[in-house]
């Protein structure tokens, strides 16, 4: 079957925002006006079409990025809903990775909030073209012009208004379209479906001219001919201006800013027009880079004629279909029943059912093309970030990077039946979410869950209980400490064991030293002249790696260490890889002690937004948690306090802050770096764990 929509008519985009900026409501309205959703789901009633997991409906925050296909003005929109809570930024990164553009939703009353900065930085990292929608213009305190200033001050970006609000707060009734120089005024009776195009109100005429001039000047900077014509007094016509704005968005020269209120159904259709007019198609963004099976860099262009390649960006467990893998097709054509190769894992797979997803109903399809976002049922091996491709033309597309978890909890199933269910459930959850890890504590035998924050783990436990019906006891959250050596040492160790017949013999000399933070573990063999035969070097590495997981201070993983094997001795008969592994293990442990190993603790970047009355209490409380205040500024009438605080002192902070500020202060927290723990903390941790 031939392609139904030309690839230049595709818009693969996401909606990104701070929690509560109205992102899910905006997505809902888009689905409603594009005819895919028959009734509007309200987030605060827990019924939004996109928020389809029970946990999301209760909390009113979006957790999983559902992918939905809709149509507007003959263009095909593939919308990825992204979570706005800081514990789920991994989901945001994952969806930004496969998008061509994004709509950044701001709360007009709050402007740029902490999580907006986080998702904006992630958008910068993946060079995602963006437009900005100032939502909630009907709210008390809504201020479109403050949002423009915030984008400059807090995001360091260049906003260009393409609309101006008509009225604000309860008097907000529409906007001035600066491209057409007309007023769009919403009809009160039509639930937002109808608006009138009118002349610009007289009291806004001067402001409209001023902002129109700024818009045109930003646009003509991108084209010499348009600039020359403009300097001669000729403004670009509507089609040229739209093309120039589109060019500005795609090159990242500026970010068009629109306004509206999704909840009150004003401004959604012009936002859809802007998505179509200004955001890129798959042809407007650079071809994706990959490597072939020989390690050479190759490109895959958005073209049906190129070999098929797709990237798995989300794995979900569906009660009706089983495991669903969401994929972005970067090149070629994919047919159901085709054999593909998972080049990341070197495994063969067969494509079973192919589905197009609307928030949570599905349509079976037989063929999908470059630019499509599809859900594949029945893949057994695929994990998030894997490449699937044509077996005749193998390629591994750019990999996604996932941060290490910083918080962990122990979980104990209550019965044998729960134990079995838990194993299956955890394997599925870990496959769905790469920032969630599962391990077994070697000494206690407990199952340990690791995640990005308290909320992240709360939700995983909730899913275990609800979806998988696992009854379990949950331990108190524990901090993921690390250990690191602080000085360079050279150390030798000889392992000798003689018990009749063949003995064991190996001697090694290691240099152990700290490497740069974030460098991880590095090993280098400096052996010359065969002091340690080549075949025993893997035994040496194995010995080091067996200690890395459990250091000498309190048994935590050792990070940022460089180990060099510089000398050794062996015996023709008694030496073996195992003997060298045993010798190295003992040598490395002693070297870590000699090298003054210290305990590292995760330090979180905390931002508290509080009414001024509570500032003193908040700062005093953060100081008592060993926090270091980095700075304060005003945001509207609230005080914003930035601090670096050890994670171990932040447990239960949400309840403390709530009671301290009568529920009026909010905070966000994300991992920033590891730092050496003070001696008293280290001693306390050693007592508990060593």
Curated annotation (Swiss-Prot):
Subcellular compartments: Cytoplasm
Binding site for GTP: 17-24, 81-85, 135-138
Presence of the UniProt keyword Cytoplasm in the record: yes
Molecular functions per Gene Ontology: GTP binding; GTPase activity; guanosine tetraphosphate binding; translation elongation factor activity
Alphabetical list of CDD domains matching this protein: EF-G, EFG_III, EFG_mtEFG1_IV, EFG_mtEFG_C, EFG_mtEFG_II
Keyword Cytoplasm tagged: yes
GO CC, alphabetical: cytoplasm
Pfam families: EFG_C, EFG_III, EFG_IV, GTP_EFTU, GTP_EFTU_D2
SS bond list: none
Domain tr-type G positions: 8-283
Keyword vocabulary terms for this entry: Cytoplasm, Elongation factor, GTP-binding, Nucleotide-binding, Protein biosynthesis
NCBIfam families referenced in this protein's UniProt entry, alphabetically: EF-G (TIGR00484), PRK12740.1-3 (NF009379), PRK12740.1-5 (NF009381), small_GTP (TIGR00231)
Family membership: Belongs to the TRAFAC class translation factor GTPase superfamily. Classic translation factor GTPase family. EF-G/EF-2 subfamily.
Function: Catalyzes the GTP-dependent ribosomal translocation step during translation elongation. During this step, the ribosome changes from the pre-translocational (PRE) to the post-translocational (POST) state as the newly formed A-site-bound peptidyl-tRNA and P-site-bound deacylated tRNA move to the P and E sites, respectively. Catalyzes the coordinated movement of the two tRNA molecules, the mRNA and conformational changes in the ribosome.
PANTHER family (UniProt xref): RIBOSOME-RELEASING FACTOR 2, MITOCHONDRIAL (PTHR43261:SF1), TRANSLATION ELONGATION FACTOR G-RELATED (PTHR43261)
Protein name, as recorded: Elongation factor G
Lineage per the UniProt record: Bacteria, Pseudomonadati, Pseudomonadota, Alphaproteobacteria, Hyphomicrobiales
Gene field: fusA
């Amino acid at each position: 079957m031939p392609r139904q929509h030309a690839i230049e008519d595709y818009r693969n985009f996401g909606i990104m925002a701070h929690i509560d900026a109205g992102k899910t409501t905006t997505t809902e309205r888009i689905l409603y006006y594009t005819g895919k959703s028959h009734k509007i789901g309200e987030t605060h009633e827990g019924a939004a079409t996109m928020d389809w997991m029970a946990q999301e409906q209760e909390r009113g925050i979006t957790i999983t990025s559902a992918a939905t296909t809709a149509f507007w003005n003959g263009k095909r929109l593939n919308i990825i809903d992204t979570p706005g809570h800081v514990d789920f930024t991994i989901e945001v990164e994952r969806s930004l990775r496969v998008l061509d553009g994004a709509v950044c939703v701001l709360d007009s009353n709050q402007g740029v909030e902490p999580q907006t900065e986080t998702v904006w930085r992630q958008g910068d990292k993946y060079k995602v073209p963006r437009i900005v929608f100032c939502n909630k213009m009907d709210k008390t305190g809504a201020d479109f012009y403050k949002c423009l200033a915030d984008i400059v001050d807090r995001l360091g970006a260049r906003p260009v208004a393409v609309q101006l609000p008509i009225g604000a707060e309860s008097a907000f009734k529409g906007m001035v379209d600066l491209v057409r120089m007309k007023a769009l005024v919403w009809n009160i009776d039509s639930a937002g479906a109808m608006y009138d195009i009118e002349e610009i109100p007289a009291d806004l005429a001067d402001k409209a001219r001023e902002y129109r001039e700024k818009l045109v000047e930003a646009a003509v900077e991108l084209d010499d001919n348009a600039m020359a014509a403009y300097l001669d007094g000729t403004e670009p016509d509507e089609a040229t201006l739209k093309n120039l704005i589109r060019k500005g968005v795609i090159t990242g020269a500026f970010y068009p800013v629109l306004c509206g209120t999704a909840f009150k159904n004003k401004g959604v259709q012009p936002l859809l027009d802007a998505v179509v007019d200004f955001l890129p198609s798959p042809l407007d963004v650079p071809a994706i880079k990959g490597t072939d099976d020989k390690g050479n860099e190759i490109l895959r262009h958005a073209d049906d004629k190129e070999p098929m390649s797709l990237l798995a960006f989300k794995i979900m467990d569906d009660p009706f279909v089983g495991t669903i893998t969401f994929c972005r097709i970067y090149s070629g054509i994919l047919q159901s029943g085709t054999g593909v190769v998972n080049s990341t894992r070197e495994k063969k797979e067969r494509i079973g059912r192919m589905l197009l997803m609307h928030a949570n109903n599905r349509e079976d399809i037989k063929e999908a093309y470059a630019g499509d976002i599809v859900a594949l049922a029945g893949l057994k091996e695929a994990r998030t970030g894997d490449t699937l491709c044509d077996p005749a033309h193998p390629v591994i597309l750019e990999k996604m990077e996932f941060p290490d978890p910083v918080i962990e909890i122990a979980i104990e199933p209550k019965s044998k039946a729960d134990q079995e269910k838990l194993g299956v459930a955890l394997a599925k959850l870990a496959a769905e979410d790469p920032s969630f890890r599962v391990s077994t504590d070697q000494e206690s035998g407990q199952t340990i869950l690791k995640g990005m924050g308290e909320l992240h783990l709360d939700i995983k436990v909730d899913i275990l209980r609800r979806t998988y019906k696992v009854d379990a006891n949950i331990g108190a959250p524990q901090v993921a400490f690390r250990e690191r050596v602080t000085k360079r040492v050279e150390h030798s160790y000889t392992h000798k064991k003689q018990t009749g017949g063949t003995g064991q013999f190996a001697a090694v000399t290691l240099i152990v030293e700290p490497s740069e933070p974030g460098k991880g573990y590095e090993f280098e063999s400096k052996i010359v002249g065969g002091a340690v035969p080549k075949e025993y070097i893997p035994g040496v590495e194995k010995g080091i790696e067996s200690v890395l997981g459990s250091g000498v201070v309190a048994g935590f993983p050792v990070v940022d260490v460089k180990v060099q094997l510089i000398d050794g001795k062996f015996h023709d008969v008694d030496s073996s890889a195992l003997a060298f592994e045993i010798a190295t293990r003992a040598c490395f442990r002693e070297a870590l002690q000699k090298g003054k190993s210290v305990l590292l603790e995760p330090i979180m970047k905390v931002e508290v937004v509080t009414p001024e009355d509570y500032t003193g209490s908040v700062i005093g409380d953060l100081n008592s948690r060993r926090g270091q205040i980095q700075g304060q500024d005003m945001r509207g009438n609230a005080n914003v306090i930035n601090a670096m605080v050890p994670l171990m002192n932040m447990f239960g902070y949400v309840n403390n802050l709530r009671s301290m500020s009568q529920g009026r202060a909010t905070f966000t927290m994300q991992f920033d770096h590891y730092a050496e723990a003070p001696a008293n903390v280290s001693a306390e941790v050693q007592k508990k764990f060593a």
